[in-house]
Amino acid sequence: TRZGVREDPSVRAIVISVGSGATKDKVGSTGAAAKALVERENPRVRAWVTERGIVARPPTIG
């Protein structure tokens, strides 16, 4: 795991919008569950758990 990445289910998730890959209904899910939902819904979106919640990022273009 990269430094600063946490898989702590007690962390409240905040899903940052990256288009259709992340939707507001996932806000409030626990970290691991929300991460799995985002990545299952759009496998090209990378999501990871931070201390502030879920951060999701679209794939790098290029």
Swiss-Prot record:
Q: Which InterPro entries match?
A: Prot_inh_pot1_sf (IPR036354)
Recorded superkingdom: Eukaryota
Q: Which UniProt keywords apply?
A: Protease inhibitor, Serine protease inhibitor
User: What would you give as a GO molecular function for this chain, any one?
Assistant: serine-type endopeptidase inhibitor activity
- Describe the family membership recorded for this protein in Swiss-Prot or TrEMBL: Belongs to the protease inhibitor I13 (potato type I serine protease inhibitor) family.
Q: What is this protein called?
A: Trypsin inhibitor MCI-3
- What organism is the protein native to? Momordica charantia
